[in-house]
Amino acid sequence: MAPSNAARMQPDPDGDFPDRMTIRYVDGSAPASLWPDPEAAARRAGFRVVDRQVVPTARILAALSTALDLTEGQVPGHALRTCYLATRLADAVGLREADRETLFSAALLKDAGCSSNAAAITRLFGADDIVLKGRQATTDRGLLAYAAFTIRSLPATEPLPLRIRRLIHIGLTGSREQHQIEQLRCERGAAIARKAGFGEPVGAAILDLHEHWDGGGQPRGLRGAAIDPLARILAACQGLDIYVSTRSRADGIRVLSERRGTWYEPDVVDALLEACARGLLDDLLAPDIAARTFALEPGGP
């Protein structure tokens, strides 16, 4: 008969590698003589052992963010570049360490909810949601700008009567539906970040990312200081990268200046423009931007 405290093979208590086994006594303690090489004992017993590898969280998020860039219709590396700009700006303005950590994670996860509204966008415009998202990112606010965006976005392959009906529908309901689309995206992205364990501060920054300083943003129409402070930094940085990477450095700086006090917080814009004058954009499109960004990770190696 086996002793009452016999050693047995039990599943990995962490629960994240169900095929990995470890050796424990019945009472839960570990036999010290087996700890030097428990995996070898598991293999001898016929169990498959999955090696654990420690991969920095930033690298995992960066890989995921590249897929999100494509879904968002942006040049691959957009979230990484936004993260680079935001972290450099955080250093320049002396943001405290905890906020820098939140900002870094929120930048890489900022578009986590971007695929949640794909079906709604396609249904509304009848066109590829990825193309529309990329185009909308460089569309100004206002009735004329939105009308021009809508006309350009209608599928040319559709019969003219159908396009006219779609245009009328968007004119009558587009504002409400666009709000619902943006609300879904922001709320879903924040929820994903929270469920992934990044905490409420990261979720709050993602939720408020598309709010505008003057209250004209989405999804809640927040104004000024009511907007999450880290979201204000991310908003300006992501806007700058979109124009720099799809148009030119001059366009990025011009749009940033034009949106000062409307889309973006004036103090953030001023600090960002000052950093640009000191060469912030010099490395933005460098092929090793990922490595440069990882090197800025708060609390990183």
PLM segments and residue spans:
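Histidine- and acidic-residue-rich, metal-dependent catalytic cores
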Residues: 34-35, 46-301
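Intrinsic-disorder-associated, low-complexity terminal segments enriched in Asp/Asn/His/Tyr and depleted
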Residues: 12, 16-19, 37
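Extreme N-terminal basic, low-complexity initiation segments
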Residues: 2-8
